[in-house]
C-alpha cells in the first residue's frame, strides 16, 4: 500500500525527514535526541498538566486563558521593543486577538486543517500583508508538517518547532516574532501540549531576551539551544499560569 508523503527539512543542513501519512509516523522524534530536549519536553508537559489539574483550571479556565493571553501579548510587544501606552496598540498585541476566548476554537480548528490561512491571519493582524516575506517553500513544508504529523513527540515539540522555524528564519520579516509566538500558542492548543492556552511562555522570553536572540541566530548550527530555551519558556510559563490559577 502506498501512502502520501512529504519532506520537512529541519534546522541543520542535510537534516530532512520523509513524513508519511501513517498513524505511527512521528516526524519530530529525531529532535528528541538533541541534547536536553527530551528531559525539558517532559518537564514542560508535567508543569502544564499540573495547572490544568487544578480546580480553578477546570472551573475557571476561561479566566486563566484570558489572563494568560493578555500577559503574553504584553510580553510579546516588549520582546519586539514596542512601547505600551494608552494611545496605540502594538501589532504584536493585535495578533493575539485571534486567540481571544470567542475566537480560539475557530482559530485552532482552522489551524489543524489549513495552517497557512491562520498564519496569514496572524500576519495581517500584526500589520503584515498575509504572506511570508521570504522562503515560501519553508512555510509550505511547515504547513504540511502541521497537518500530516502525528505522535507523542509531535504533540510535545510542534509548538516549539513552529516558533523556531518562523522566528529563526524570519519568514515574516519584522513580524516574525509576533507570528511565531501566536502560532506556537495555537499549535500548543491544537496538539494538546497546552490544551486550554494557560501557559505564558512570552514572559520568560522577554526576561531572557538576549539569550533568545542568540539562540535564534544560531538555530541553523545549534538547534538544541533554541528548542531547549523554548521548552524552558513553556515550563516557566506554566508556573506563571499556576499563579494565575491560584488567584482566580
PLM regions: where:
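FIC/Doc superfamily catalytic core
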Residues: 1-248
Amino acid at each position: 500500500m502506498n501512502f502520501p508523503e512529504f519532506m520537512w527539512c529541519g534546522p541543520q543542513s542535510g537534516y530532512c525527514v520523509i513524513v508519511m501519512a501513517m498513524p505511527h509516523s512521528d516526524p519530530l522524534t529525531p529532535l528528541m535526541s538533541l541534547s536536553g530536549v527530551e528531559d525539558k519536553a517532559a518537564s514542560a508537559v508535567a508543569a502544564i498538566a499540573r495547572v490544568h489539574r487544578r480546580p480553578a483550571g477546570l472551573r475557571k479556565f476561561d479566566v486563566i486563558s484570558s489572563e494568560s493571553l493578555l500577559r503574553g501579548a504584553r510580553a510579546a510587544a516588549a520582546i519586539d521593543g514596542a512601547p505600551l501606552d494608552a494611545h496605540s496598540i502594538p501589532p504584536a498585541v493585535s495578533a493575539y486577538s485571534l486567540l481571544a476566548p470567542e475566537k480560539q476554537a475557530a482559530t485552532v480548528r482552522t489551524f489543524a486543517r489549513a495552517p497557512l490561512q491562520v498564519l496569514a491571519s496572524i500576519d495581517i493582524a500584526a500589520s503584515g500583508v498575509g504572506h511570508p516575506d521570504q522562503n515560501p517553500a519553508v512555510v509550505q513544508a511547515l504547513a504540511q508538517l502541521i497537518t500530516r504529523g502525528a505522535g507523542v513527540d509531535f504533540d510535545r515539540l510542534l509548538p516549539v518547532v513552529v516558533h523556531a522555524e518562523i522566528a529563526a528564519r524570519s519568514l515574516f520579516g519584522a513580524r516574525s516574532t509576533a507570528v511565531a509566538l501566536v502560532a506556537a500558542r495555537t499549535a500548543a492548543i491544537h496538539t494538546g501540549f497546552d490544551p486550554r492556552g494557560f501557559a505564558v511562555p512570552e514572559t520568560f522570553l522577554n526576561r531572557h531576551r538576549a539569550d533568545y536572540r542568540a539562540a535564534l541566530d544560531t538555530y541553523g548550527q545549534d538547534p538544541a539551544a533554541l528548542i531547549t530555551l523554548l521548552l524552558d519558556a513553556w515550563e516557566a510559563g506554566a508556573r506563571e499560569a499556576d499563579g494565575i490559577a491560584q488567584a482566580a
